[in-house]
Each structure stands twice: as C-alpha cells, then as structure tokens.
UniProtKB/Swiss-Prot annotation:
This is Ankyrin repeat, SAM and basic leucine zipper domain-containing protein 1. The keyword Cytoplasm applies. GO terms for biological process: cell differentiation; male meiotic nuclear division; regulatory ncRNA-mediated gene silencing; spermatogenesis; transposable element silencing. Plays a central role during spermatogenesis by repressing transposable elements and preventing their mobilization, which is essential for the germline integrity. Acts via the piRNA metabolic process, which mediates the repression of transposable elements during meiosis by forming complexes composed of piRNAs and Piwi proteins and governs the methylation and subsequent repression of transposons. Its association with pi-bodies suggests a participation in the primary piRNAs metabolic process. The modification Phosphoserine is found at S17, S18, S20. SMART domains: ANK. Signal peptide: none annotated. The keyword Repeat applies. Transmembrane segments: none annotated. It comes from the Eukaryota. ANK repeats lie at residues 45-74, 78-107, 110-144, 148-177, 181-210, 214-243. The lineage of its organism: Eukaryota, Metazoa, Chordata, Craniata, Vertebrata. Residues 272-334 form the SAM domain. Its main location: cytoplasm. The gene is ASZ1.
Amino acid sequence: MAASSLWGPAVAGGGESSESEDDGWEIGYLDRAPQKFTAPLPAEEKNEMFKKALTTGDTSLVEELLNAGISVDSSFRYGWTPLMFAASIANVNLVRVLLNRGANASFEKDKQTVLMTACSARGSQEQIIKCVELLLSRNADPNVACRRQMTPIMYAARGGHPQVVALLVAHGAEVNAQDENGYTALTWAAYQGHKNVILKLLELGANKMLQTKDGKTPSEIANRNKHPEIFSLLSLTLNPLEGKIQQLTKEETICKMLATDCDKEKDNLFSSYTAFGELDLFLHGLGLEHMTDLLKERDISLRHLMTMKKDEFLKNGITNKDQQKILSALKELMVEEIKFGELPEVAKLEISGDEFLNFLLKLNKQCGHLITAVQNIITELPVNSHKIVLEWASPRNFTSVCEELVTNVEGLSEEVCRLKDLIQKLQNERESDPTHIPLVEEVSPWKSRLLKRTAVTVCGFGILLGICKLMFQRKLL
C-alpha cells in the first residue's frame, strides 16, 4: 500500500509501512528539475539528492551519485533499498541501472523481497514483466515466501498479471504453493476474478482442487465473490489445459507465454459478461478454441449450444469427439432433476432416513442452482430499454410471470417451514420417549442444520426473485 498523499513507497501485500509521513520518498513529486552537482556535497545532502533522483526517475543523476560514493544498497526509511523502491513503481530503467551497479536482487526486509515488490508493483504489465525478468536474471528466488507465506506468483496472480505468472513458473516458481490461509495463486486469481490468470494457471498445471484452511476450493471462492464465469470454468471436471507446457524447456516456455496476441488481450481485459464471453470461456476450458469462429459465424450462443440435439451438432459441423467433450462438460453443469415420481411414498411411512435426506439434499441443491440462474439473468439484462436489440413482448407479461414466481416461492417457503416444524416436533417426541434408544448418527446435529439451511435457501430465493422483479421493472422504465 502507499502512504498518504504523495509520500512513502508502495509496499507489497504482506509488508508494512510506517505511520510517519517524513520518509524522504516523494513519489511523483517534482518541485524543480534535478540539478547536477559540480562540487563535493555533504553526505546528508547527497542522500537527499539521491532520493529525489530516484523518485523523479533521473537515471543519469543516480549514476553520477553512485559514482560519487553513494551506496547502491543504501537503507532509507522502512529499511528499503533504492532497488526495492524502483521495483515498487516498475521503473525498468532504474531497476536495470541499479542491478548493473551491483544492487542486491535478493534483498528482503521483514521477509518481503524485491521480487515480491515487483510482482505487486504499480504499472503496466509490460513494465512489471521487464522488472521481474531483470530480477530473475540476477538469481532472485521465485519461491521465497513472506511472513504470510505468500510467494511472488501469488502476488502476480492477485494483481492480474498472467504473463508475469508464466514467467515465474518458467523460472521454477511452485505453481501450487499455499500461503498461511491455504490460498494458492489460483485461489487468489479466483478471489479477484482474473479470468486470464485462471486460464494461464490451469495451462501451467495449477491444481484447482486444493482447498484453503477453511475447506474452500478456488471455484467456491470465485462463487462466494460473485465471479460466475470463473466459477463455471473451475467447476468443470475436465481440465484439458492442465500441464500443457510441463514438457517444454525454460526458453520454450518463456517464448510461448510471452508471445500473446495484444488485441485478444485487450478484448479480454475490457469484455463484459456477455453470451459470447461465456462461449469463449466454455470452449477455452475444454480445449475447443478451434470451434469459436465456427460457432460465432453461425450465431450460436452458449445457451443454444447447451440445448443442442445430436442432429444439430452434426448439422453445424461439430465432430463426434468434440460433441463428447461438450456433453460431458454440460452434464457436470446441468442442474440435477429431482424425479418426484420415483420418490418413496411418505404416506406409507416406508421412506428411509437416507432416502428422505437425499430428497432434501437434492431440493437444496436445486434451490442453489436456481438462485445462481436468477443472479446471472439479473447481470445479463441491459440497464436501459433502448439497449435491447431484439423486439420483446410487453414488459407486463414478464412482470406478471415474476409475480407468479414470487408467489410460488413464498408458498414453497411456507411448506418447507411447515416440514421443518413437523420434523422438529417428531424429533422432540422421540427424544422425550423413554423407550427410544438414540442412534449414534442422531446425536450429530448436522442433519437438522441441513434442513434449516434448506429453509433459509428457499427464503433467500424468494427474496432474490423479489429483487429481480423490482430491478426488471426499473430497467424497463
């Protein structure tokens, strides 16, 4: 983080800064042009001039002061060296000059290394890549961890820099390292919603099943932080990208990772959550990028693809092999239907506890999927009515259906609450029955918590539909 106003150096995540504003670093501040000195200066004045030269990026003056005896590894406030400051603002020229003059690329302060600072720097990805590459070329260790056990690749992933991530892995960074909370680079990227970093990490062999200390996978972290694209991608069982470059040499890996299409990078950076954005992501996750142009030419959206029959696949030129990949992935994403006709007849009292629990689990899962579906619809609806391209029916029709949905969900909520009360009553009666011998599994309260969670989920779905209805009306005004 940076100190207040224009004062103080940037500190990588995991580092600490002082409360003092009198630190001598004036980032971006220039009240006068740097002046070259012709006569010997006192040490204190030389140090001040050195700081000004660093903050203004005056590499010529920096070299002149180094020639005059200033140490290249001078320690200023916070214990930072000039190289760490230059890395924090991704000033490539300064980093190069300081390294060429012998600056320590492996310097660390309170377990925070120069490489970590560079990976979390302020600046463009191109500048950060060059700084990181310079540091790695001077044997900076990409696997050293800070006090929070975060490594440089985690900082790069959290900052949204896929090429920096690839460069670090090419130089030996452990892609599945975990910090003190069990977060990996993939988890950090999922937390921040960096799609390009997610795709790059999967290609580099990141394990998407590693859990945090509280038992969350990257996909669950993405879902919790409202990143539906990332959640869908990481929820796929298949991972055709995994380990694609594991057999390449370091040089081949660097060339492959850094040779990216600038236009594509720009499009991905500014793309919104659109139907074709979903389609691109879905195909990329299955290794079917070659189908993207074909489907776009035929104006086939992801929603259309998900409902295709076999004859439609063939008609649109999708091979059997590709069909199998798509169908397998869709099977994982589809909501599991509850076949109510096959459920045991409760009235005959022949239903087993396991069967009834299975029913409740399926019902709860369905409600969760329905909530996610409505959230996605809310996200995709245009803000203003003039942005709707195709002709829609009267908005009153949609509002009417939403009202019916709200009514039905409220009814479902009431019935689930009645069911919960009934089960609670049965449970209380059994516990008070002196002839009843409780089973070991009944001692655990997790089943009753599941029922409560189901009731809360249904209630939440009702509230969500109400919000959906209000937002829908507002967007069509």
